[in-house]
Amino acid sequence: AVRIHGRYAVAPNGATRLITTKQPVGPTLMITPWNFPLAMGTRKIGPAIAAGCTMVVKPAHETPLSMLALAQLLEEVGLPKGVLNVVTTSHSGAVMEPLIRDSRARKLTFTGSTGVGKKLVEQSSEQLLRLSMELGGNAPFLVFEDADIDAAVAGAMLAKMRNIGEACTSANRFFVHESVAAEFSEKFAARMGALTVGKGTVKGVEVGPLITEKARAGVDELVQDAVAKGARALTGGAPVPGKGFFYAPTVLADVPATARVPGEEVFGPVAPVPTFRD
């Protein structure tokens, strides 16, 4: 493809020339997540088109229509049929494993959980596929004793509540020095508790629903585990009553090391605040 350039250089001994050429890797398998279905899809599809690769894309079963719409738009603007192929399914493992083991596949790119990523790496080892893995995270947010607490709270809101926490880049645990933990937690809880929860189509709503009831139940399980082991919910701490998969923005104080929540990716509007001394 004309956009993918190689490299020319003279060897250190000056006697030879080194030429690197880049070629399409070949048919590429792509697995995209539900939390940013178009953004995650386009960042994989765009480079593949530029490089001259054909693709098989398997979108998350929760959000298949976004990828189907994108494929239709690309065909309408001239992408040849067969370059981008979309496979929708609610049985991802059964569908993807034969594709991964197919000798025609050359590369696999996946955005999703670490657990699924490990399985995909294992399956792809038979074919020695080239891999691009963007897996889950457990990002810490640190507040030291000399911090500007108001600025720290403002930063914590941005870090936690992007996409209501349903993002691998969201801060997942807030380690706060014990000398400022009470002030930080109180102000953080006040900001979180003041957020308006509801349908995203309603003006003024700041926190929408989680993706599924299963996701909401998983978030609540982590919260209840922490509370049972001694944590305190300064705000929230439970699903929002009524229809929908809403969960109240939650700040947990006095989170013990034995709780699951600091060590697992929450993927929801829950902020555990364990403390440290040095």
Model region roles, listed by residue range:
Residues P262:
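Short, solvent-exposed loop/beta-turn-alpha elements that line the ligand-binding surface or hinge
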Residues V2-G6, T196-K199:
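Short amphipathic alpha-helical interaction/hinge segments
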